[in-house]
A protein has these predicted regions:
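Short, structured motif recognition centered on aromatic/hydrophobic residues
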Residues: 19-23, 36, 67-69, 76-82, ...
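Active-site-proximal cofactor/substrate-binding loop regions of enzyme domains
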Residues: 31, 46, 69-73, 90
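Conserved active-site tyrosine of GNAT-family acetyltransferases
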Residues: 32-37, 119-123, 212-217, 314, ...
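Post-signal peptide N-terminal segment of secreted/secretory-pathway proteins
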Residues: 59, 68, 78-83, 88-101, ...
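Structured core of small recognition/catalytic domains
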Residues: 190, 198-200, 210-303, 307-310
C-alpha cells in the first residue's frame, strides 16, 4: 500500500472535465458577443491584462481585454473572446476547407443543420467573406467499415455535418439521425441557430511521428479512446472537410474528458480531435497564424486539478515556451506552453 504524508496529495496532476475554452482573437468584443449570442452564448466575466502581464503569460507584447462566453449550464466547450491592442496578424483566414497545419475549429451539435446552412448560404449571396461546405451525410456504418443501412428499408444512423469558415470563425455543425447521446452536447432551442456548446475542438498536424501525440494522454492525463487510420475510401465527410486528395489517407485521434465512457449513453462532449496527415502530404503550414495574439481561433484551454504539479509535468514532458504560473485576465492561476506538436495551450487551476 502506498504511504501518504498528511497534507500532501497523492493525486496525479491531470486535466479535469472537457476542453474548457476555444479562444478567439477579435477586433471588437461587442460585435463578436452579438455573433455568438445567436449560437446560445452569453457574456460572463470580463477581464484585462496590461502588455507586460500578457507577455509573461501568453508571450504577446500587447494589452488584452477578454470576455468568457457561457452556454446554458455547460462547464466545457466555452468561448473566450480576446481583444488584443496590437494583434500579431489576421489569423488563419478564409480557406475552402479546414486543411492546414495550424488549423483549429470548433464543433457544435444543432437541431437543424439546414437552418445553419440557410444563414451561411444567404451570407455568401450577400457577398460576405465566407466559405461554406454544405451538409454532408456520414453514415456511421460506412465510416466504421461495417454494413450500412439499406435505404428506404432500414433506419439510417449517422450525422449531417457542415463547415462555415469566416475571417474570425471556423465552425463545424452536425445534426444527429437515428441515435441519441445525452451527455454529448446540449442544444439551446431558444437561440437563432439552435446549437449546443462546443462538443469538441480540432487541430491538424502533418507528422510521421505518431508518438508526438502521447503528450496529451501521458502528460495531460486525457483519455485516448479513438485512434485510427481513415483511408480515402472510408472518409465520407473528411474528403471535403479536410481536402483529401484521391487515395490519400489520414489518421484521427480523439482525446476525451477523463470521465467519458465509450457507450453512447456515457460519452461526454469536450473532446479534442486531432487530424494527422503524413509529413509528405501537401498541407500548408499556418501554425504562426494560430497562436495567442492572432485574430481568429488561436488558443485552447483546459482546467487541471493541480496547476503547480502539472507545470512540472509539462516542463518535463517535452513542451516548450512554458510560462511561469501567473494570474490571467480573469484572476485565475494559469500557465501557457507550446505542446510537442507545435500548438499553443493555456492550463487553468480548476
Amino acid at each position: 500500500m502506498a504511504q501518504t504524508t498528511p497534507g500532501i496529495s497523492t493525486v496525479r496532476p491531470s486535466c479535469v472535465g472537457g476542453l474548457y475554452e476555444l479562444c478567439v482573437g477579435v477586433p471588437d468584443l461587442a460585435e463578436s458577443i452579438a455573433y455568438y449570442e445567436r449560437f446560445g452564448c452569453r457574456a460572463g466575466r470580463f477581464g484585462s491584462l496590461d502588455s507586460a502581464a500578457a507577455l509573461a503569460l501568453y508571450g504577446v507584447d500587447s494589452a488584452l481585454r477578454s470576455v468568457r462566453l457561457h452556454h446554458l449550464d455547460a462547464d466545457h466547450g466555452l468561448v473566450r473572446l480576446m481583444q488584443w491592442e496590437r494583434p500579431r496578424n489576421d489569423g488563419l483566414g478564409v480557406d475552402p476547407n479546414l486543411r492546414c497545419v495550424g488549423s483549429r475549429w470548433g464543433v457544435r451539435l444543432t437541431a437543424s443543420v439546414l437552418n445553419v446552412a440557410n444563414h451561411a448560404a444567404r451570407a455568401k449571396e450577400l457577398g460576405q467573406p465566407i466559405a461554406l461546405i454544405d451538409p454532408i451525410l456520414a453514415v456511421i456504418g460506412e465510416v466504421t467499415g461495417e454494413a450500412a443501412a439499406r435505404p428506404f428499408a432500414e433506419p439510417i444512423v449517422g450525422v449531417r455535418e457542415m463547415v462555415v469558415i469566416q475571417p474570425l470563425y471556423r465552425q463545424v455543425f452536425f445534426e444527429r439521425f437515428g441515435y441519441q447521446s445525452p451527455l454529448y452536447g446540449r442544444v439551446d432551442p431558444g437561440c437563432v441557430m439552435q446549437t449546443s456548446q462546443h462538443t469538441h475542438a480540432g487541430l491538424m498536424i502533418a507528422n510521421d511521428d505518431h508518438q508526438v501525440l502521447r503528450f496529451y494522454d501521458e502528460v495531460l492525463g486525457l483519455k485516448r479512446w479513438f485512434d485510427a487510420e481513415r483511408p480515402y475510401e472510408q472518409a465520407t465527410g473528411s474528403r471535403t472537410i479536410f481536402g483529401l486528395e484521391p487515395g490519400e489517407t489520414h489518421w484521427m485521434v480523439d482525446f476525451d474528458d477523463p470521465r467519458s465512457g465509450h457507450s453512447l449513453e456515457e460519452r461526454r462532449s469536450g473532446k479534442l480531435k486531432i487530424v494527422r496527415f503524413a509529413k509528405s502530404s501537401r498541407v500548408a503550414d499556418k501554425l504562426d497564424r494560430s497562436r495567442p495574439g492572432c485574430l481568429g481561433y488561436s488558443l485552447y484551454t483546459w482546467r487541471v486539478n493541480d496547476l503547480e504539479g502539472m507545470w512540472k509535468r509539462v516542463q518535463a514532458g517535452g513542451a516548450t515556451t512554458v510560462s511561469d504560473v501567473r494570474t490571467d485576465e480573469f484572476g485565475a492561476r494559469a500557465f501557457s506552453f507550446v505542446a510537442p506538436d507545435g500548438y499553443s495551450w493555456t492550463l487553468l487551476q480548476a
